Amino acid sequence: MSRIAKNSIKISNEISCKFENGTFFAKGKLGEMTLPVDSEYFVDISSDEIFVKPRNEKGKLNPKWGTIRSLISNIIKGVSEGFSKTLELNGTGYRASISGSILKLQLGFSHDINYSVPKEVKVECPKQNIIKLSSYSKEILGATAAKIRSYRKPEPFKGKGIKYENEFIFRKEGKKK
């Protein structure tokens, strides 16, 4: 039996949840999200907590049970608090600026990179070398941050590139004479 799946998910009064026709719905102050749930499981919603349970207790319980519980937990946290990631640009002349929904990146190429940010993600550039991303969807936020980081991954010799806020870049020694 999955240890994660046995735990309940606490919900606050400001979030409304329902489970209909194999789909979980959640609505909070930051937005609303849905999740299709496998037919082998159902979601039991009480006033202040949620349980994910298998429909057939005697059958083989597979790893999807804990995954579904974690996805629902992320949805609840997303619509109530939201998620955020911070990216740092390290390198001479590396900068970022935002205009509307276009993120303009100068990363040492002969041209600027214009990245169209998804509407679910909010972007801020408090400094020229810092990008703050926030969203109610952990999946979209992670994909957006990974796509921005992929334009110039940190290299191990000088550490130049785009990295996550607390990411450690393993440094290598250069050539020896």
List the model feature ranges, each with a label.
Residues 1-177:
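Ribosome-associated RNA-binding proteins
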